[in-house]
Amino acid sequence: MKFSVLGCGRWGSFISWYLCSKKGYDVCLYGRESSKAFQLLKNTRKNEYVSLDEKILLTSELEKAVDFADIIIISISAQNLREFVRDLVANYHLKDKKIILCMKGLETPSGKRLTQVCIEEGIDKNNIAVWLGPGHIQDFTNGIPNCMTIDSYNK
């Protein structure tokens, strides 16, 4: 199983580190070239919480990240999700991909849940899951037990 994590902030970089370093999966981490977080990871392969294994493919090419994975994890600002998903659906083959949202919040203008936003933009509801907790990256990386869950329409 291959994962792509779209968004290289704290959660995105942590999830990539966890899936590769702790679980042994093949992982691609995508970030925008203009992102400070991406530049830091590109230049040092680390941030304040994790050091990325050399096996993690780090890219600013969205097509490469989408094509790489069986499962796509999106970890971006909730307020940017609609436009981001609209671009994904319009420009990339997502039919056989599972999408996991690892972000919290509601879309501010509409008050809609993030899964609703994805469905409205053309992602099959049976291919969407949410990964939520209470959880803090610094606790996970320091070995402090946390609880997170993944849920979806597709039981």
Model regions and ranges:
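NAD(P)+-binding Rossmann beta1-loop-alpha1 motif at the extreme N-terminus of oxidoreductases
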Residues: 1-60, 68, 87
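Conserved SAM-binding loop
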Residues: 29, 58, 73-74, 150
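Rossmann-like NAD(P)(H) cofactor-binding subdomain of soluble oxidoreductases
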Residues: 52, 62-64, 71-145
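Short beta-strand and adjoining strand-loop segment in the mid-core
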Residues: 141-155
